[in-house]
A protein has these predicted regions:
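Beta-strand-enriched cores of mature, soluble protein domains
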Residues: 1-122
Length: 122
């Protein structure tokens, strides 16, 4: 993760997964999640991943802030296996308010969770 102070944490629950054929005999999974992120209230989103032990992914979400505002978020990142049915993820994301963050987290398939932290870029 880029140098800087931790801006916040997130805790997401995976709510569903949709599998579709991908390029070159790959399989894509759309992972839907919901939860909370520090300073961004309730978050609902979807990441699209090429199924495997490592690879790229992209995502988009909507953040429903406590003050009633809505902020959107898009990201691109990579993942790699970090244990049995666990994956470590790193991404760079852009909020519609102009803020850019570096994100690190871990997905746990058994628990159906994605938890991590983010740091705002200066």
């Amino acid at each position: 993760m880029a140098a800087g102070q931790q801006s916040g944490e997130f805790s997401f629950k995976i709510t569903s997964q949709i599998f579709t054929p991908g390029p070159a005999n790959s399989v894509l999974v759309q992972v839907n999640f919901e939860g909370t992120a520090s300073g961004y209230g309730t978050v609902l989103g979807t990441d699209t991943v090429v199924v495997g032990k490592s690879g790229p992914y992209s995502g988009c979400s909507a953040c429903y802030l406590d003050n009633g505002e809505i902020t959107t978020y898009t990201s691109r990142g990579t993942y790699e296996s970090s244990g049995r049915h666990k994956w470590r993820l790193q991404e760079v994301g852009q909020f519609s308010n102009g803020r850019t963050v570096d994100v690190e987290g871990e997905v746990d398939l058994a628990a159906r969770t994605w938890n991590g932290k983010f740091v705002e870029r200066s």
